[in-house]
Amino acid sequence: MQSYNTFKGPDGDFNYIDWGGSGPLVHFGHATGFCAGTYTPIAEKLCHRLRVLGMDDRGHGRTTAEANPRNLKNWNTFAEDLEQFFDHLREPVIAIGHSRGAVAHLLLAVKRPDMIRALILIDPTILPFSWMWWWYLAKKTGFARRIPIAARAGRRNPFWPDTETILNTYRTKQPFRSWERGFLEGYIEDGTTPSDSGGIRLCCTPEWESRCFSVCPHDIWRYIPQIRQPTLVLYGAASDTFLAPAVKRFQAKVPHAVIRRFDRTSHFVPMERPDETVEAIFTFLQEKGLLSGA
């Protein structure tokens, strides 16, 4: 049975889910706009051989720590929050992260290698190296706020009359309509909260989600060659996020990394291919001697 718990950070409370399970300790980091509960279907599969936790990042889910978009300068904030949480756990973890959650774990793995035993990056938000100068200028000039993904997030409707309405609406839209059952339901259950004006609202505000996208790291490639942990990268062949030039450069910079592509799969690998994702994770951990038993 999963349980909801609170970690008290220096500037507020962080919610995390303990899905249970036995075996090595795992933390599963979520993508921007979502929450830990979104990944409950895959976390429950991982629990067959692992102990799985997932924290709602600042500005997401049930976490109530301060989330002022004006104060968010980069994704180091999320890595620092993870550092506080992992210090609270008092045990190194196998770090699994999706999208921005993958990058937050990567940043912490380089800063605090003692905290992370292995790094599993699922379609990480790592832009091609050739884009970095342009992205740096976009951030400096404020143009980053106007890129399509940030602009769309900023216009997102956060208010809904009830969970049934938002579920029925989202089921017909991409990316949700390609997700396996349970992921969207987990997102709506833990990613919405009662609104003061009636109905429900998204926990991750449009302003915060947009800001997260617009401060995506422009210097991530300086950290990638410093990865020393056993590393697995899973990505979708149809991803619009982890593109072929980035895949190729990542392999060159981290030659010990195991990289696997999922055909006919988008950025949302865990939601579209949960069984294959779990199988790939178990196989990797077994081969690295980090998973015992059959």
Predicted stretch roles:
Residues D18-A67, F85:
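Conserved HGGG/HGGXW glycine-rich cap/lid loop of the alpha/beta-hydrolase fold
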Residues M1-G29, C47-R51, P69, R90-P92, ...:
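Alpha/beta-hydrolase fold catalytic core
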Residues F262-P274, V278:
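Catalytic histidine-centered segment of alpha/beta-hydrolase-like enzymes
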Residues G182, E189-A252, R261:
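Conserved serine/cysteine hydrolase catalytic core
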Residues D57-I96, W135-A138, E279:
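Active-site loop/oxyanion-hole signature of alpha/beta-hydrolase fold enzymes
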Residues W131-D196:
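Helix-rich cap/lid subdomain of alpha/beta-hydrolase
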